[in-house]
C-alpha cells in the first residue's frame, strides 16, 4: 500500500513536471515575435547575393552566345546578324522566358562583357505564361530596389535569432537594418 502510494505520488510529480515543461515551451513561443510577414503589404529585402530577375544591357552585349552555351536548358534566345562592313556580329534581339528559367545564374557568371546581372526582383507571377517571356526592352528595365520600396517594412525584433547572427550577418539586410525605436 505504501509503495503504491509512493509510486503514485512520483508519477503525479513527473506528470506535473512534464506539463510544466510543455507549458513553459508554449509561453516561450507566445512571447516570440512571429517570423511570418503579411506579404502583399510587407516585403522581405532579399540578400545581397539573391538571384532574382535577370537585367540585360543591350549596348554591352557582343552576341557571343556564351550565355546560351552555359545555360543548362539553353534558354536565352540570341538573334544576331553578321555585319560584313565591321566584321563582327550585330545583336538584333535577346529574350529570356522566365517561366522556364531556373535562375541558376550561369549566364550572369560567365558573360564576358557583364551585360547580364541579377536583380532583387522576385515578383514575376502573372496569369498568362507568355507575359514571362521578356525581350531586351523588358530585360533592360531596372526594378525599384526593395530597400527603397515604400511597401517594405523591416522585420523588427527577431528575438529568437542568436545575437551573433544579428550582428555578423551582412547577407540579410532585413535582420540587421532595422530601426531601434
Curated annotation (Swiss-Prot):
The keyword Membrane appears for this protein: yes
Positions annotated to bind [4Fe-4S] cluster 1: 61, 64, 67, 111
Catalytic reactions on record: a plastoquinone + NADH + (n+1) H(+)(in) = a plastoquinol + NAD(+) + n H(+)(out); a plastoquinone + NADPH + (n+1) H(+)(in) = a plastoquinol + NADP(+) + n H(+)(out)
A GO molecular-function annotation: quinone binding
Binding locations of [4Fe-4S] cluster 2: 71, 101, 104, 107
Subcellular location(s) per record: Plastid, Chloroplast thylakoid membrane
Coiled-coil annotated residue ranges, if any: none
Enzyme Commission identifier(s): 7.1.1.-
Membrane topology: Peripheral membrane protein
UniProt cross-references to PANTHER family, sorted A to Z: NAD(P)H-QUINONE OXIDOREDUCTASE SUBUNIT I, CHLOROPLASTIC
Subunit structure: NDH is composed of at least 16 different subunits, 5 of which are encoded in the nucleus.
Similarity comment text for this entry: Belongs to the complex I 23 kDa subunit family.
The protein's name in its UniProt record: NAD(P)H-quinone oxidoreductase subunit I, chloroplastic
Source species taxonomy: Eukaryota, Viridiplantae, Streptophyta, Zygnematophyceae, Zygnematophycidae
Chain's gene name: ndhI
Amino acid at each position: 500500500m505504501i509503495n503504491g502510494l509512493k509510486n503514485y505520488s512520483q508519477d503525479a510529480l513527473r506528470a506535473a513536471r512534464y506539463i510544466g515543461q510543455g507549458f513553459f515551451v508554449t509561453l516561450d513561443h507566445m512571447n516570440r515575435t512571429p517570423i511570418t510577414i503579411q506579404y502583399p503589404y510587407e516585403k522581405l529585402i532579399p540578400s545581397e547575393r539573391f538571384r532574382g530577375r535577370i537585367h540585360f544591357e543591350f549596348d554591352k552585349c557582343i552576341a557571343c552566345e556564351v550565355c546560351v552555351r552555359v545555360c543548362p536548358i539553353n534558354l536565352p534566345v540570341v538573334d544576331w546578324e553578321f555585319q560584313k562592313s565591321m566584321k563582327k556580329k550585330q545583336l538584333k534581339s535577346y529574350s529570356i522566358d522566365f517561366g522556364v528559367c531556373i535562375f541558376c545564374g550561369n549566364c550572369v557568371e560567365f558573360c564576358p562583357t557583364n551585360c547580364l546581372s541579377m536583380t532583387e526582383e522576385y515578383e514575376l507571377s502573372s496569369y498568362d505564361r507568355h507575359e514571362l517571356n521578356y525581350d531586351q526592352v523588358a530585360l533592360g528595365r531596372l526594378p525599384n530596389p526593395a530597400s527603397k520600396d515604400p511597401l517594405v517594412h523591416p522585420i523588427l525584433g527577431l528575438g529568437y535569432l542568436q545575437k551573433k547572427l544579428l550582428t555578423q550577418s551582412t547577407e540579410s539586410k532585413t535582420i540587421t537594418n532595422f530601426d531601434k525605436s
